[in-house]
Amino acid sequence: VHLTDAEKAAISGLWGKVNADGVGAEALGRLLVVYPWTQRFFEHFGDLSSSSAVMGNAKVKSHGKKVITAFADGLKHLDNLKGTFSALSELHCDKLHVDPENFKLLGNMIVIVLSHDLGKDFTPDAQSAFQKVVTGVATALGHKYH
């Protein structure tokens, strides 16, 4: 991902303002509600029968925290996303057989949640920078599929 110094600074500054665990839980929950076919990877999470069940599900929240922790790690290694996400790419490709398109969808959910949480601070330029990052992360996670 090619980011300018200004974009990197915006990402770093804004990321420090959010509750990362909350972003992860909300983003994963929204993914499962908005794109219900993604629930097939999480059937062992229990009740996912409605949006309120998904958003209140402790396992969704816990996994959302794992997801966003990995994403936050990527923010520390923006110049090496492929290397940073290599093991996760292998896991999701070889063992979990996740459609790599789902990584793009989740990235979009992260951007939506950041927009909501950051309000006016999430300017169009900030959105552009984060969109580049989530696209780069999705590409890195899909790397083992190619």
From Swiss-Prot:
The modification S-nitrosocysteine is found at residue 93. SUPFAM superfamilies: Globin-like. It comes from Ondatra zibethicus. Keywords: Acetylation, Heme, Iron, Metal-binding, Oxygen transport, S-nitrosylation, Transport. Heterotetramer of two alpha chains and two beta chains. Gene3D superfamilies: Globins. InterPro entries: Globin, Globin-like_sf, Globin/Proto, Hemoglobin_b, Hemoglobin_oxygen_transport. The modification N6-acetyllysine is found at residues 59, 82, 144. The modification N-acetylvaline is found at residue 1. Belongs to the globin family. One of its GO terms (molecular function) is metal ion binding. Involved in oxygen transport from the lung to the various peripheral tissues. This is Hemoglobin subunit beta. Heme b binds at residues 63, 92. GO terms for cellular component: blood microparticle; haptoglobin-hemoglobin complex; hemoglobin complex. Residues 2-146 form the Globin domain. It comes from the Eukaryota. Red blood cells. GO terms for biological process: hydrogen peroxide catabolic process.
